[in-house]
Amino acid sequence: MNSIQFPLLDRTAKNSVISTTLNDLSNWSRLSSLWPLLYGTSCCFIEFASLIGSRFDFDRYGLVPRSSPRQADLILTAGTVTMKMAPSLVRLYEQMPEPKYVIAMGACTITGGMFSTDSYSTVRGVDKLIPVDVYLPGCPPKPEAIIDAITKLRKKISREIYQDRMKSQRANRCFTTNHKFRVGHSIHTGNYDQRFLSQPPSTSSIPTETETLFTYKNSVSSHELVNSAGFFGTK
């Protein structure tokens, strides 16, 4: 069953008995029907769109893309995440029902990519916002790599215990790395923070040559002017 082995029942026996636990049954049902919420913001998402075609056929994994976070149990982030997007992404993750999983796809999502050095508005890794289960590096990763990431996530689901996962999330509520976010009043006003913008001096504030000379003359004391006048008069 897609690289995940389960004991098969003997269909020839009439009185077959299934011996399992509620946790194993729950894991089997969840890994066979992952419903992803597609959060694509950049070019990496184009590679995931290739899985929809008949060549890769991601329907065989039980993947059904959803447009509502309340109906999804997997969020796949692909592309750059900016500071302005961060609250929306966290809100989408919190609206997903438990248990929920995250796949970080691409270098820009995992580390910030080429925007991680000079950009002041890029989040250096989506794991600073939401907990990530599977990291998928690449720029962009191939569709085969995405299938491998989904397979690894299904293996993780098949072995986990739901109670342990909930305890781990309560103890380590995200974030092993300290981020440097600045709390603002609102991000949906449409106005930029003026402190980050360099304001060029206006033309009215640039003094002309006449104003400079006049300012210099005003700065000279009257005593100096009298002395200079007397000096020129003697000559």
Curated annotation (Swiss-Prot):
It is an enzyme of class 7 (translocase). Its EC number is 7.1.1.-. One of its GO terms (molecular function) is 4 iron, 4 sulfur cluster binding. Binds 1 [4Fe-4S] cluster. Its main location: plastid. Its cofactor is [4Fe-4S] cluster. GO terms for cellular component: chloroplast thylakoid membrane; respiratory chain complex I. It catalyses: a plastoquinone + NADH + (n+1) H(+)(in) = a plastoquinol + NAD(+) + n H(+)(out); a plastoquinone + NADPH + (n+1) H(+)(in) = a plastoquinol + NADP(+) + n H(+)(out). It holds the Pfam family Oxidored_q6. GO terms for biological process: aerobic respiration; electron transport coupled proton transport; photosynthesis, light reaction. Keywords: 4Fe-4S, Chloroplast, Iron, Iron-sulfur, Membrane, Metal-binding, NAD, NADP, Plastid, Plastoquinone, Quinone, Thylakoid, Translocase, Transport. NDH shuttles electrons from NAD(P)H:plastoquinone, via FMN and iron-sulfur (Fe-S) centers, to quinones in the photosynthetic chain and possibly in a chloroplast respiratory chain. The immediate electron acceptor for the enzyme in this species is believed to be plastoquinone. Couples the redox reaction to proton translocation, and thus conserves the redox energy in a proton gradient. Belongs to the complex I 20 kDa subunit family. HAMAP family: NDH1_NuoB (MF_01356). This is NAD(P)H-quinone oxidoreductase subunit K, chloroplastic.
